[in-house]
């Protein structure tokens, strides 16, 4: 599939690690030039160093800071000469709280990174896409679809991301800007951190539930194999007639309401 995004200009937030890093590498391998945004400068610089020269840049950016977001997108406009695609993958979670004991500061942090970060980056991307169109892909979550009692702030934040995606897809469609979301269940560093805060019995129960409730056996998806092709589809010419959708890449769990 190399070359399918040749000439495309993209920004990937949260692009130094996890899903974002795989997407950034996959886009460059498909011919796109990418500005990678993150706060993990060591990982971001290392990723860019591993990619073909002049195809990728890294910039430190806190997606909750409007000034940093504006400056990053202005750099993209200068370096790339415009913007065709935003893949907004930056996000975070603080699991392990019930709704009744969730601290206000945790709620504020999780909502800020996930929901406010989506608002700021999408808005900045639209300004660069308004004249010629483009594609925005936001990372949602199964938590935002069904709600998870041990991840109340994350559920609320990702629910907001999915609602925002539908709202702006409607508003920006006349400008030929598509906006879609993906709700993945992948084996990533976020998933590992979630599993790490569970005890052995909770992990065992989770694995049993996953196998019982997923038609594909409960395995976590592989980003390169199961998620990246969809992101490239939505970003490229094959995705121009899809907008306002949430694509669950989760082995069928959403289909079964699990």
Regions found by a protein language model. Name each.
Residues 122, 157, 165:
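Active-site helix of classical SDR
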Residues 97-99, 103-109, 210-211:
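Substrate-binding pocket helix/loop in short-chain dehydrogenase/reductase
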Residues 141:
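Residue(s) in the substrate-gating loop at a strand-loop-helix junction
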């Amino acid at each position: 599939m190399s070359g399918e995004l040749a000439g495309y200009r993209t920004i990937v937030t949260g692009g130094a690690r996890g899903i974002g890093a795989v997407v950034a590498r996959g886009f460059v391998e498909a011919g796109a030039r990418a500005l990678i945004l993150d706060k993990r400068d060591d990982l971001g610089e290392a990723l860019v160093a591993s990619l073909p020269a002049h195809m990728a840049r890294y910039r430190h950016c806190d997606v909750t800071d409007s000034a940093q977001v504006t400056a990053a997108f202005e750099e993209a406009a200068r370096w790339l000469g415009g913007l065709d695609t935003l893949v907004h993958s930056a996000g975070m979670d603080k699991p392990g709280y019930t709704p009744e004991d969730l601290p206000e500061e945790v709620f504020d942090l999780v909502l800020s990174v996930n929901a406010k970060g989506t608002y700021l980056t999408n808005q900045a991307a639209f300004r660069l896409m308004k004249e010629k169109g483009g594609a925005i892909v936001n990372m949602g979550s199964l938590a935002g679809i069904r709600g998870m009692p041990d991840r109340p702030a994350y559920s609320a934040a990702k629910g907001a991301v999915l609602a925002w995606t539908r709202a702006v897809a409607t508003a920006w469609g006349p400008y030929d800007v598509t906006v879609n979301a993906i709700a993945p269940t992948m084996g990533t560093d976020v998933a590992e951190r979630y599993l790490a805060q569970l005890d052995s019995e909770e992990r065992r129960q989770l694995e049993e539930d996953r196998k019982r409730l997923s038609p594909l056996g409960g395995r976590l998806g592989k980003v390169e194999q199961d998620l990246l092709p969809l992101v490239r589809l939505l970003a490229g010419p094959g995705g121009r007639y899809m907008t306002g959708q949430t694509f669950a890449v989760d082995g069928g769990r959403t289909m079964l309401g699990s």
